[in-house]
Design a protein with these regions (language model features):
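Short, conserved "active-site rim" segments that organize catalytic pockets and cofactor/ligand binding
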Residues: 3-85
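Well-ordered alpha/beta subsegment
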Residues: 104-108
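Short, intrinsically disordered/low-complexity patches at protein termini
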Residues: 53-54, 101-103
Length: 108
């Protein structure tokens, strides 16, 4: 599994981003996760991050977007808040993720 670069992120579309999340969720349901070197991913994302999707989810400690979608470090911008509602702070984070960081998809 690779860490996204600016080039790979730019090739992603909303459709391919959603497909990645669906495939990852299927792996999660089947308890078959991709093998990742987390130490390597930390190094590879140290100089920049190029997530392809933004996920707004509940603050519930039992649910992590990276786990339920079987994604690695730097793949998602995860925004967590009680009740999954959007206020100015959350909206600002979502705008940053899409406009400045280049995510292709927002999932609530």
């Amino acid at each position: 599994m690779y860490t996204h670069t600016q080039e790979t992120q730019s090739k992603m579309t909303p459709v391919s981003s959603l497909q990645n999340l669906r495939e990852g969720n299927k792996r999660f349901q089947e308890n078959v996760r991709l093998s990742r070197n987390l130490v390597q991913q930390v190094r590879e994302t140290a100089s920049g991050q190029y997530p392809y999707a933004t996920v707004l989810s509940c603050i519930d400690s039992r649910v992590s977007s990276e786990l339920i979608f079987d994604q690695g470090m730097g793949d998602l911008f995860s925004i967590r808040i009680a009740g999954n509602f959007v206020n100015e702070d959350i909206l600002g984070s979502m705008e940053f993720a899409c406009k400045l960081a280049g995510t292709k998809l927002v999932v609530v």
